[in-house]
Amino acid sequence: MSPLLFGAGLVVLNLVTSARSQKTEPLSGSGDQPLFRGADRYDFAIMIPPGGTECFWQFAHQTGYFYFSYEVQRTVGMSHDRHVAATAHNPQGFLIDTSQGVRGQINFSTQETGFYQLCLSNQHNHFGSVQVYLNFGVFYEGPETDHKQKERKQLNDTLDAIEDGTQKVQNNIFHMWRYYNFARMRKMADFFLIQSNYNYVNWWSTAQSLVIILSGILQLYFLKRLFNVPTTTDTKKPRC
């Protein structure tokens, strides 16, 4: 019974290992069908703990344009260092580019198909967390496969002009969307900065008010003791 169980366990282990080792990138069904090219875009905010690192993987096809931008919105904790380090690696694990600062960008052309790694490190801040706003994705300028080029030859001049105009409008909309995200990142960073300054001014004003009131009470107490004249009686008289 035990040899059968051991053999079944090996079979299950092999199946799990083979399933985990498979690539999850899209595959084309046949040679006539073009490879799917999706323009995935992401924008969200994450909280990185003190000294921590957060990584993301984005799938991209060859001959694409990869963009990645970030901005530190606020800090939480004892330290207020807002600098972070960003890195981008290709599917083979080789470093493509780095960026350090409160905000930055990493843009490059994808030379191979696979998952590209993006990492953000809070290594400069060991006593506080940072909230970082991210905006990254892949954009493809237009059809570049042989299948699309053959289809373009079959279109007349009018449809070709309409397609070119539509592609230009799509590119302009995409770049305007990126500028809009830059404005959102800057707006949120300014909002958190104003809120932090507002809280700082309120706490500092309250502390100064308490110090002024306490110092007034102490001054009144010492002045009262200074002018306090002891009463004289028959049994208790001041000495010469």
Swiss-Prot record:
| Keyword terms, alphabetized | Endoplasmic reticulum, Glycoprotein, Membrane, Signal, Transmembrane, Transmembrane helix
Q: Which InterPro entries match?
A: Emp24-like, GOLD_dom
Q: Where is the signal peptide?
A: 1-21
Q: Where in the cell is it found?
A: Endoplasmic reticulum membrane
Instruction: List the stretches on the Lumenal face of the membrane.
Output: 22-200
Ligase keyword on record = no
Q: What membrane topology does the UniProt entry give?
A: Single-pass type I membrane protein
**GO process terms (BP):** endoplasmic reticulum to Golgi vesicle-mediated transport; Golgi organization; intracellular protein transport
Q: Which SMART domains match?
A: EMP24_GP25L
Record Pfam families: EMP24_GP25L (PF01105)
Transmembrane regions: 201-223
* Domain called GOLD: residue spans: 53-138
Provide the residues annotated with a glycan attachment (glycosylation): 107, 156
One GO cellular component this record assigns the protein to is:
endoplasmic reticulum membrane
* Keyword Cell cycle included in the entry's annotation: no
| PROSITE patterns linked to this entry | GOLD (PS50866)
Topology, Cytoplasmic side: 224-240
- Which PANTHER family has this protein been placed in? TRANSMEMBRANE EMP24 DOMAIN-CONTAINING PROTEIN (PTHR22811)
Family per similarity comment: Belongs to the EMP24/GP25L family.
Q: Under which name does UniProt file this protein?
A: Transmembrane emp24 domain-containing protein 6
Q: What's the source species for this entry? A: Homo sapiens (Human)
